[in-house]
Structures are given as C-alpha cells and as structure tokens.
C-alpha cells in the first residue's frame, strides 16, 4: 500500500502515527495509523490492522475533478475481495456533489506475468527496470521506519534509533 501511495504522491516529508499492540501484546503492532504529507501538501492516510478480522485492500484517491477507488486484490486466498477500480468524475450537471462513476472489475491477475516480462526485457535489452526498483523498495522501507519512528510511545518502548 505504501509503495502505491509513494507512486501517486512521491516522497512524504511529514509523518504522524499511532502504533499499538494492545490486543496481543507482542513486539509487533496490532494496528498502525499513519498520516503522511508530501512537499506539495497532499495528505495520505494508512490504517493497517490485524484486529479488523477481515482482509481488506482499499485505496481512495481524492482529486480536484473526481476520485479513484481501488478495492480488493486478486490473491491466491481470494480473501481480499473482488478487485475493482471505481472512477468518479465531476461534471457540470452534478452540482450536488454526485459524480458520474464507472466501475471496472478485474477477473484475471496478470501482475506477475507483466512484472516478469518487464524484468526479463530489462535484462535482455540491458535497460533499467522502470517500476518496482530496489531503490523503490528501499524508500518504501524508509517510510515504514518513519511511521514506526514518529510514534513517540512506540519509538521509546522499543528503543528505535535513527
């Protein structure tokens, strides 16, 4: 989820978070809540929960002329729900806040195939990988660290240092 947020917003410059492990009391979080702001002032919010008792994948993107909602993941477990994208567009006729929406359902997962094709092409053609680079992974892990670090209680409890 964080890698998608970075894809849409770039790097986040400000992070506020609340991390808890009150349910199981293990040294890993039960719930993480993060608010992140990028240099343009765009705000992203993440809730990762192990106590929601249902797998969910929802990414809502609010735009000046509409919105995009991503739901579900086509996974082997089928536990994240139906994968679909809903696109809402503001129109001149819809002054009451309602938008024209279109929903597309995805029934086939081609992501692994597409990623392998891109990776193999980069090797064969000696070109850089375009998406999902090791640097992307590193920057996403830095963001994960920043989320844990920005919660004073969590940081002190687990002695997290820069």
Task: List PLM regions with ranges.
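Conserved glycosyltransferase catalytic-site signature
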Residues: 2, 28-32, 134, 141
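Generic structural signal for secondary-structure transition and capping sites
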Residues: 10-17, 43, 66, 128, ...
């Amino acid at each position: 989820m964080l890698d998608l947020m970075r894809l849409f917003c770039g790097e986040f410059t400000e992070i506020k978070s609340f991390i808890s492990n009150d349910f199981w009391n293990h040294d890993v979080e039960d719930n993480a809540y993060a608010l992140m702001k990028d240099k343009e002032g765009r705000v992203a919010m993440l809730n990762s929960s192990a106590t929601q008792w249902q797998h969910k994948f929802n990414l809502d993107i609010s735009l000046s002329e509409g919105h995009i909602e991503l739901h579900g993941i086509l996974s082997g477990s089928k536990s994240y729900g139906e994968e679909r994208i809903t696109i809402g567009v503001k129109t001149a006729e819809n002054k009451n806040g309602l938008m024209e929406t279109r929903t597309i359902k995805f029934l086939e997962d081609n992501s692994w195939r597409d990623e392998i094709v891109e990776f193999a092409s980069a090797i064969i053609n000696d070109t850089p990988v375009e998406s999902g680079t090791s640097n992307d992974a590193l920057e996403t892990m830095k963001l994960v660290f920043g989320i844990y670090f920005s919660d004073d209680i969590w940081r002190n409890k687990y002695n997290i240092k820069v």
